Amino acid sequence: MSSVPARRGDAHIDFARSPRPTIGVEWEFALVDAQTRDLSNEATAVIAEIGENPRVHKELLRNTVEVVSGICRTVPEAMEDLRQTLGPARRIVRDRGMELFCAGAHPFAQWTTQKLTDAPRYAELIKRTQWWGRQMLIWGVHVHVGISSPNKVMPIMTSLLNYYPHLLALSASSPWWTGVDTGYASNRAMMFQQLPTAGLPFQFQTWAEFEGFVYDQKKTGIIDHVDEVRWDIRPSPHLGTLEMRICDGVSNLHELAALVALTHCLVVDLDRRLEADESLPTMPPWHHQENKWRAARYGLDAVIILDADSNERLVTEDLDDVLNRLEPVARKLQCADELAAVADIPRHGASYQRQRRVAEEHDGDLRAVVDALVAELEI
């Protein structure tokens, strides 16, 4: 049971409520120099040339451009939305001698040469987090799914943790760190959790518990705004969504569509089961903590914990059953083809596996890894 008080007088957080399970996607890209393949701190100039565009955002570091979709009903609609923004953006980037690059981390870039975006909230973050904050050379994909009631948010979020290792293993794309093979499939997952309020969410049962938590965080000066809760899965109250932030950066639209479809189907499936008064599956937090580590370390070779009884199974074997169970949901959500494409990732190799193959084929030259990832982005 949570020890967070159920309610405080001024702790209320409005949740916007989404009448439909709409989706929105945030896709973070790094800028790399076309000649050196190293990171380029030119995002401010790129965004200025793109002009006022609600689909293109700046981020913490000046090597990063975030492309976002609008509010979409289906995965194909979201992918087309992103494609429409990416095409012109990439032309501008290429005209400036750079390429768009996406993975959980850059294979060899050094944090000491990266410049911060000029914004008070970023300056405050670095002032507080210091060395760890400056180390955040990481990129990810965030998927928002609309939820109709705040009363559903915590039960769905807690149950979604059971699928954390599946999503991380499939998307893992950060085996390298400053030129070194870390031995991990996703070093990004290990890095990001070093920031305050980041990492696995607390397993609250009610919205009131979450409100109490945020109240305490604000009162003690840990955060100023609810958006500073940086959990791997978190509510976005002003949007009326659950935001899945598990996935490493994804290099291509085919895999992105597959992972977004899997996320959409998982959330909607749990939502419908909750409406049918089913009890949603949960596990103790120590199992989720171990599953996160196993998926980050071993990727698709991870043996994960399945339930509160501590049963285990290879993540790819369990994934097959998950995909079969979600197939009817995907048909109703008009993303059956995209969900089926999830199986292509283990079949062809996840990004971390492909990156290591490229490095081996090029005698360890990590510039070739950057080239391979850049080439995967077909718009």
Curated annotation (Swiss-Prot):
InterPro entries (alphabetical): GCL_type2/YbdK_subfam, GCS2, Gln_synth/guanido_kin_cat_dom, YbdK
The UniProt record lists the keyword Acetylation: no
Enzyme class: ligase
Protein keywords: ATP-binding, Ligase, Nucleotide-binding
MF terms in GO: ATP binding; glutamate-cysteine ligase activity
GO process annotations (BP): modified amino acid biosynthetic process
Function: ATP-dependent carboxylate-amine ligase which exhibits weak glutamate--cysteine ligase activity.
UniProt protein name: Putative glutamate--cysteine ligase 2
